[in-house]
Amino acid sequence: MWEKVIETIAYLKSKGLRVDAIGWQAHLRINSLSKEELDYLDYLIDWAHTNNLEFHITELNLWVQDEITDLDSIQNVQSNIYQKLVNKLISKKNNGVIALNFWGLKDRNGRQKHNKNILSIYDRNLNPNPCLETIKSCFNNGE
């Protein structure tokens, strides 16, 4: 998919049109961000910065297909995934603009079978989820 995005951006720029950024809607699953996926993300961010584009991760959340029976386990997975992602962004901060946005602030039910539960940085009562502390820790350690 991203190769088509890169081709499209190159085409638009060749026509003299302005393109400022690439955005990735990061609706992640519990098996997201393998080493291969992180390596490709690394390539994509570098490509964006080399081509004077900002790189934005938008709509970050975790989609859980099944009913959550072990919330602690899922929150641990969420924290690990977010840690990988945030550390990747921090590693690129001196190369160009990067941005991180969330898709909603609190956990909620989804309306489709692939996202029965949508987890964010706060629980349904707006108490911080463990991943929020993980994100803060990444930023504090990445300065």
Place the predicted regions along the sequence by residue:
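Short hydrophobic alpha-helical module
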Residues: Y11-K15, Q25, W47-E54
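Distinct, well-ordered alpha-helical segments
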Residues: M1-K15, S34-L41
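Short, conserved beta-strand edge motifs with alternating hydrophobic and charged residues
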Residues: A21-Q25, H56-E59
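Surface-exposed cleft-lining segments at the edges of enzyme active sites
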Residues: W24-K35
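Short helix-capping segments at alpha-helix termini
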Residues: S14-R18, K92-N95
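Conserved residues at the C-terminal ends of beta-strands
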Residues: R18, Q25, W103
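Aromatic-rich peripheral "rim/lid" segments of glycoside hydrolase catalytic domains that contact
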Residues: L33-E143
